[in-house]
Regions:
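Hydrophobic alpha-helical segments and their helix-loop junctions in multi-pass secondary transporters
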Residues: 166-193, 201-205, 210-221, 370-382, ...
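Extracellular/periplasmic helix-exit of transmembrane alpha-helices
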Residues: 61-72, 224, 246-275
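Transmembrane-helix boundary/entry motifs in multi-pass membrane transporters
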Residues: 7-11, 45, 72-101, 124, ...
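Membrane-interface loop-to-helix entry segments
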Residues: 140, 144, 148-179, 359-366, ...
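Flexible loop linkers connecting adjacent transmembrane helices
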Residues: 2-4, 36-39, 65-88, 122, ...
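Extracellular loop-to-transmembrane helix junctions
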Residues: 12, 39-64, 81, 87-91
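Transmembrane alpha-helical segments of multi-pass small-molecule transport proteins
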Residues: 96, 122-150, 167-173, 324-343, ...
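Hydrophobic transmembrane alpha-helices that form the core helical bundles
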Residues: 90-126, 300-319, 351-353, 403
Length: 418
């Protein structure tokens, strides 16, 4: 009995330490990650490994920086920008608006891929096809999201979805071990370079945007403040960040390896959502389609919930008010988010391309956030907690990386729409 109590206590302590990080993993490891990493691996093997490594490295630096400011001052970042920058109010308002727009745009891709895969699964399992099924799936998923978010009772569903995503994540890790390419290929992919092919710049920006995004950084600050963490919890925050980013890296690189070891060797790049099923075939065989679709739809829905909630969260950051899921403002944005979800599957764009476009857009707006946090961490009122030389070098690296990814994103989006 005592042993059981000790185990429960250990689990409780682990969850307490990883609280904010679990949100980040749930938000980050979803449809966007699977789509971009699988697309990259299927087209160019392991040659874009450097993008995953640098994205995760600078995600860690960004999370550390945003966490540090909130732990020291107790302020969230948008509010700090509004209060402490010259022209801070319009700058913070622009960042808030850009994050909301980018996240709402990403809802279209998340819902489009989820509906597309469920539709294909029903056709595969039953042999029956009807255009009305897609509409029924779209309305059903949107209605479920609306009811859950309106009531605020979605914790149980989140746990179920997290379990499904975990199964998919473990499946990718195990498959990666079966099809892992040579170390020579992996190390060659650590040398930065972008393939001279159409869509390469857009995909590189999308890979960065799905990992190192402004939304994750601001949500990190908001969740720390909501938990009441201050400098006394700095060690817990650091452990939480390391574990979260470590899991992001492992799962992202595993997905790329799976695609490189299956689709790339067959010369079958991901063109449609259903193509990604093949990445799990070495492990699951004929069950790959069911395993993949259950996992990625779980990942999609688990990403839809925090993506819709980001709008009221960043508004509460900007206005320096408590997060209230039952407020009129929150419910307006929940309603808008669900309407966007309804539209997603019917946009005249391939769901895979749509998902990559939305991830690239997140990379485009990143530089403002990295520049802002670097300035905030160098202000006099932080005293001994100001950035030292090492942290400033790290922040400058994050700024440079975000500018390069933003450039790739702009060029990629421009090329696509032209």
């Amino acid at each position: 009995m005592a042993q059981s109590t000790n185990k429960s206590s250990m689990v409780a302590k682990l969850l307490a330490v990883l609280g904010p990080g679990l949100f980040l993993i749930g938000y980050n490891i979803g449809t966007g990650s699977v789509t971009t990493m699988a697309s990259a691996g299927s087209r160019w093997g392991m040659s874009l490994t450097w993008t995953v490594v640098l994205s995760c490295l600078f995600t860690y630096i960004g999370l550390f920086a945003f966490s540090r400011y909130t732990l020291v001052t107790g302020d969230t970042i948008l509010y700090a920008i509004k209060q402490r920058f010259p022209m801070g109010r319009p700058i913070a308002f622009f960042i808030m608006s850009a994050v909301i727009f980018a996240e709402f745009f990403s809802l279209t891709g998340l819902m489009a891929i989820s509906v597309d895969l469920l539709h294909e699964w029903i056709k595969y399992a039953s042999g029956y096809y009807h255009a009305g099924i897609k509409l029924a799936l779209t309305i059903s998923l949107s209605a479920m999201l609306y009811i859950l978010l309106w009531s605020g009772e979605y914790r149980l569903l989140e746990k179920i979805l997290a379990a499904l995503v975990m199964i998919m994540g473990i499946s990718f890790l195990l498959t990666a071990l079966l099809v892992v390419p040579s170390w020579r290929e992996i190390f060659a992919g650590l040398i930065p370079g972008v393939p001279h092919e159409q869509g390469a710049a857009l995909l590189v920006a999308g890979m960065a945007g799905t990992t190192f995004s402004s939304a994750i950084l601001y949500c990190r600050s908001i969740t720390l403040k909501a938990k009441g963490w201050r400098l006394a919890e700095q060690k817990k925050s650091l452990i939480d960040t390391v574990v979260s980013v470590g899991m992001m890296f492992l799962l992202s690189i595993a997905i790329m390896i799976c695609a490189a070891g299956t689709l790339y060797t067959m010369n079958k790049p991901v063109e449609n959502a259903i193509d990604m099923v093949r990445t799990l075939e070495p492990l699951a065989g004929q069950f790959a389609i069911s395993l993949f679709i259950i996992g990625i739809v779980g990942a999609g829905v688990s990403s839809l919930i925090p993506t819709i909630l980001i709008a009221p969260w960043v508004i509460s950051d900007y206005t320096h008010t408590e997060i209230n899921p039952h407020s009129k403002q929150s419910r307006i944005f929940v309603s808008l988010g669900v309407v966007v979800c309804l539209i997603g599957p019917y946009l005249r764009t391939n769901p895979v391309i749509l998902m990559i476009l939305t991830m690239a857009l997140l990379a485009v707006i990143l530089p403002l956030s990295t520049i802002a946090i670097t300035i905030l961490l160098n202000q006099k009122q932080l005293g001994e907690h100001k950035n030292g030389t090492g942290m400033n070098i790290a922040c400058m690296g994050a700024i440079l990386f975000s500018l390069i990814m933003s450039y790739y994103g702009v060029m990629g989006l421009q090329a696509y729409f032209n």
